[in-house]
Amino acid sequence: MLTLKIAVYIVVAFFISLFVFGFLSSDPTRNPGRKDFE
């Protein structure tokens, strides 16, 4: 059960960091494929 909780925390932290990095580098010149988010 502890392993499952650790895996859930890793997945949640991964998605939060992915969202933060996508929000910080949201200028369309660096990643042109993300224009549909605006």
From Swiss-Prot:
What is the annotated localization of this protein?
A: Cellular thylakoid membrane
InterPro entries tied to this protein: PSII_PsbI (IPR003686), PSII_PsbI_sf (IPR037271)
Q: How does it sit in the membrane?
A: Single-pass membrane protein
- State any GO CC term: plasma membrane-derived thylakoid membrane
* GO biological process: one example: photosynthesis
Q: Which SUPFAM superfamilies match?
A: Photosystem II reaction center protein I, PsbI
Q: Transmembrane ranges? A: 6-26
For this UniProt record, give its keywords in alphabetical order, as a comma-separated list.
Answer: Membrane, Photosynthesis, Photosystem II, Reaction center, Thylakoid, Transmembrane, Transmembrane helix
> Quaternary arrangement and interactors, per the entry?
PSII is composed of 1 copy each of membrane proteins PsbA, PsbB, PsbC, PsbD, PsbE, PsbF, PsbH, PsbI, PsbJ, PsbK, PsbL, PsbM, PsbT, PsbX, PsbY, PsbZ, Psb30/Ycf12, peripheral proteins PsbO, CyanoQ (PsbQ), PsbU, PsbV and a large number of cofactors. It forms dimeric complexes.
Family recorded in the similarity comment? Belongs to the PsbI family.
Q: Which PANTHER family match?
A: PHOTOSYSTEM II REACTION CENTER PROTEIN I
Q: What does this protein do?
A: One of the components of the core complex of photosystem II (PSII), required for its stability and/or assembly. PSII is a light-driven water:plastoquinone oxidoreductase that uses light energy to abstract electrons from H(2)O, generating O(2) and a proton gradient subsequently used for ATP formation. It consists of a core antenna complex that captures photons, and an electron transfer chain that converts photonic excitation into a charge separation.
Question: What is the name of the protein in this document?
Answer: Photosystem II reaction center protein I
Q: What is the source species? A: Crocosphaera subtropica (strain ATCC 51142 / BH68)
Q: Which gene encodes it?
A: psbI
